[in-house]
Structures are given as C-alpha cells and as structure tokens.
Amino acid sequence: MNKNKNIGIILAGGVGSRMGLGYPKQFSKIAGKTALEHTLAIFQEHKEIDEIIIVSERTSYRRIEDIVSKLDFSKVNRIIFGGKERSDSTLSAITALQDEPENTKLIIHDAVRPLLATEIISECIAKLDKYNAVDVAIPAVDTIVHVNNDTQEIIKIPKRAEYYQGQTPQAFKLGTLKKAYDIYTQGGIEGTCDCSIVLKTLPEERVGIVSGSETNIKLTRPVDLFIADKLFQSRSHFSLRNITSIDRLYDMKDQVLVVIGGSYGIGAHIIDIAKKFGIKTYSLSRSNGVDVGDVKSIEKAFAEIYAKEHKIDHIVNTAAVLNHKTLVSMSYEEILTSINVNYTGMINAVITAYPYLKQTHGSFLGFTSSSYTRGRPFYAIYSSAKAAVVNLTQAISEEWLPDNIKINCVNPERTKTPMRTKAFGIEPEGTLLDAKTVAFASLVVLASRETGNIIDVVLKDEEYITNILADLYK
C-alpha cells in the first residue's frame, strides 16, 4: 500500500510592494541566490517531502519555470497560478490537488522565508499524525498592544506570555483544509492565514503548534534583506546535517577533487576522507612544487590533472599562513607572503578553476576564519584577508550562477592544526575542533546545492561528525 504523500506548497505569488524593489520580493538576491531558490532548495533536499507545488503570480510564471528547470528542482511537479489574496493562492493549490487522498499532508510555506530549518518541516509532518492542522510560531518578545486605529489610543495590553508570533510553514491534512475552504468560500468569514480559516470554519479542530525560529524571518521590508544576508553569512543557525544527505558523498565516487594545501592539516584530512568515498584526489602544495601565490604554478598543476582525468569536479583551497605578530613588527616580506597566500592565492585558484568547473558544473570551497567578522590584533593581515575571502566568495557566487558553479566558504571555529599550534602553542584539550571534523564538514558542503554561503563548523557539530567518521573508518 502506498503511503500518503507529503507535499510542499510554496506560495510565491506576492508582488512585494512594501519592499519597494520594483520586482517581486521572492526574486530578491541573498547570498548568491534568489529567496525562492533558497526556499525551493530546502524542500528539494528534505527527505520527507515527496512533491513540491509552486503557486505563482502570473507575470512571474516564466521566470519561476526557468529557475526550476535550470537548477533541476526535480520534486517540483507543477507551477500553478495564485490569486490576489493569500487565501486565493491556497485555494488554487487545493483545487490542483483534488484527486489526492484526504490524508495527504500539505506543508504550506512562504517563498520569502528562505531561512527555514529543515527540522521544522520534519516536526510539522510528524505533528500531523496527531492533529489535522499545525502552525509554526515563536513566543512574542515585544509587548503586544491592542490599539484603536481611529483614535490611535491603546485599548488594552494583553498578557504577553499567552501570545505567540505566527510563522510558516503551516501544515494540514488535505481533507481538513479542503473542508475549511468549502465553508470559507461561501462568504462571511475573514481569515488572515490558513490556520485562522480552519479555526473559524471548523471550531472543533485543534491546531497544534511547532516551535519556530527567530531566524525564520519573512522578507517584508528593505531591512529584512540586510538581516537575511547577515544570517546567511553566518550559518550558525544552520546545522550541517541539514545541508545534504550523507548519501550524496557516495554519489561523488570517481569525481575528481583537487585540494590546494593538501599536504597537512585540514587539507590532508579532506584528501583522506574523500578517498573513503571513492573520490579521486589530488593534493597541491609547496611540497610538490605548487605555490598558491603564483598563478602560473596553479595553471600548470590544473592542466596536468585535467590531461590525466579529462575533468575536474571540485576544488578546495585550504592554503593559509598565520603570523602571530603586530603589523609593525612584521617584515615587508612576511606581509607580502601573508597577502599572497591568504588572499591573492584564493583569487588565483578561483580564476584558474573557472573553465574546469564550468565544464563539470562543479564546486569550489574556500576557508575563512571567525576573525573575518572583526579584525584581530596580532594577526591583522590574516583577519583582513579572511574578510576579503568572504566577500570574494559571495561576489563570485553571483558571477558563476549562470554557469551553475557552486562556491562556498567554510568558517571553522578554532581548529587544532599545525598552523594554529605554531602560532598559539599548545591549547587546552576540548577547546579546539578536530581537523577531521572540519574536513568532513567541508566535503558535506561540496556535495550540497549550497552556493554563496559562509558555513560555520562549530564544536557542537563534532559529536555528530565523529560518529559518522567512526563508522567510516571501521
């Protein structure tokens, strides 16, 4: 017997008048992709989502169709027209699903909430085993004020602890939502969202609550784009296990991976772990005559690998140098070396990588440091170069988007590497990430659909990754 489907419904019918962009806000760019692309990727990657329906505003239909086709969102099985109001768009989706079983689970989400965590989708799906309607909400933080809009006076201030702020997704059994809309369309009822329509038309139904997230913001005002971009810059809210299925690493078998700086530290561990998945690996470093600061050196090395393999699928640049000194105490040679390795080298690698990754629709991965958010004393060149790497990653992600090349940057917490030990000496056990953890996380990012993102790897990821590595090295 076939299980009932879990269908994601993405509401992308808004015109974004409050945003003032001159185009629908679902097409606003954040971290190298449109808000809609980010949202679709979340549902596409979710194991429990079987199909996706996009509800589109009529003038946006072709653009959405192009996005779905170009980025291979294979779970999208139809794009339908919405209406003037949100309820019109939901009704359009219900009508399109009239032949589906009543127990089909619908997960309805705003296209302009691109920072949704996948565990919220999972919790909504699970909660529908107990309820026929589920909302996502977070506790209200600010005081709620009931106002008379005519007089602009306060009527009352309710008890804040009893109030939550609604988000999406909202989830329903198809039969329940269909029944609610049958009553709603007869007129006489106002509803601001699908859950409110269920509550007003079917008062006997209990609506369950799933805890939302403060980062699951809706793009409504210009400032929201700024906030969303900052959240994408620092993906601390975004668990690595949400980026991709580990199974996708096995799909990388026989792909060609080049690691610049692969002779020791994180780079060496990337090489070692990649081999466990059957990935063909090449390490480039000074020890085999490759200088990341010399573009000719990189060009020669890439050409030799291509001549042998006839393709390059992934390139990782881990090369770095850290001088733990004040700027004025560094020699000019040390300053130039630091810039050449930490920033110019990244540029050299990106430029040289482009034609190879364009051919394979491959991916590039760089490394930054937590120091990119604020310059650090005693390693001013290093921290400023890492800030430059972040900006370069975000800029190149947009330049490379038409060629379907992914570029991301891993931002590990303090990690136990030979470079760090040389700069800072021996540090207390348990305060540093293991280089293997960062290496595995890097491969997970390479295997994902992500682009233009700065992805944190933190100590709390270590247990999750250590367990996977233990199985891998049995």
From Swiss-Prot:
Q: According to the UniProt record, where is the region Ribitol-5-phosphate cytidylyltransferase?
A: 1-238
Which Pfam families does the protein's record reference? adh_short_C2 (PF13561), IspD (PF01128)
UniProt region (Ribulose-5-phosphate reductase), positions on chain: 250-474
Gene3D superfamilies with a match to the protein in the record: NAD(P)-binding Rossmann-like Domain (3.40.50.720), Spore Coat Polysaccharide Biosynthesis Protein SpsA, Chain A (3.90.550.10)
Q: Which GO terms describe its biological process?
A: capsule polysaccharide biosynthetic process; isopentenyl diphosphate biosynthetic process, methylerythritol 4-phosphate pathway
**Catalytic activity line of the entry:** D-ribitol 5-phosphate + CTP + H(+) = CDP-L-ribitol + diphosphate; D-ribitol 5-phosphate + NADP(+) = D-ribulose 5-phosphate + NADPH + H(+)
Known EC number? 2.7.7.40, 1.1.1.405
> Is this entry keyworded Nucleotidyltransferase?
yes
One MF term in the entry's GO annotations: 2-C-methyl-D-erythritol 4-phosphate cytidylyltransferase activity
**Keyword Oxidoreductase: yes or no?**
yes
Residue stretches in coiled coil = none
The pathway to which it is assigned is:
Capsule biogenesis; capsule polysaccharide biosynthesis
Please name the InterPro entries in this protein's record.
Answer: CDP-ribitol_syn, IspD, IspD/TarI, IspD/TarI_cytidylyltransf_bact, NAD(P)-bd_dom_sf, Nucleotide-diphossugar_trans, Sc_DH/Rdtase_CS, SDR_fam
| Protein keywords | Capsule biogenesis/degradation, NADP, Nucleotidyltransferase, Oxidoreductase, Transferase
* Cited function: Catalyzes the NADPH-dependent reduction of D-ribulose 5-phosphate to D-ribitol 5-phosphate and the further reaction of D-ribitol 5-phosphate with CTP to form CDP-ribitol.
**Family matches, as NCBIfam families:** PRK00155.1-3
> Can you tell me which family this protein belongs to?
In the N-terminal section; belongs to the IspD/TarI cytidylyltransferase family. In the C-terminal section; belongs to the short-chain dehydrogenases/reductases (SDR) family.
Subunit comment: Monomer.
UniProt-recorded name of the protein: Bifunctional ribulose 5-phosphate reductase/CDP-ribitol pyrophosphorylase Bcs1
